[in-house]
Amino acid sequence: MGEIKTITAEQLQAKVEAEEVLNIIDVREDFEVANGMIPNAVHIPMNTIPEKLDVFDAKQTYYIVCAGGVRSENVCHYLTANGIQAVNMEGGMYSWNGEVK
């Protein structure tokens, strides 16, 4: 697998706090997102990504988030292989110190 783009939790938090328009996809399971998600993130569980490919726009960039950064990295590889621009948030929600909703 090729290299994928990454962003740190701190870098993504700065973008969120600057109110940038972002496409953040949280790929954790339902019970995990019940504890909170990054504001404006969209929840698409990892196992449903293949059937939801049509919701992704190849002209947009998507920031992919999970609990620790491993599942989101796998999703980034999958999306990239399907022509979608995906960026993995390193460390996942364990590294997120910003607001959650």
Predicted region positions:
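Rhodanese-like catalytic fold shared by cysteine-dependent sulfurtransferases
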Residues: M1-L22, E29-T61, V70-K101
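Short, surface-exposed ligand- or partner-binding patches at beta-edge/loop junctions that are enriched
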Residues: V65
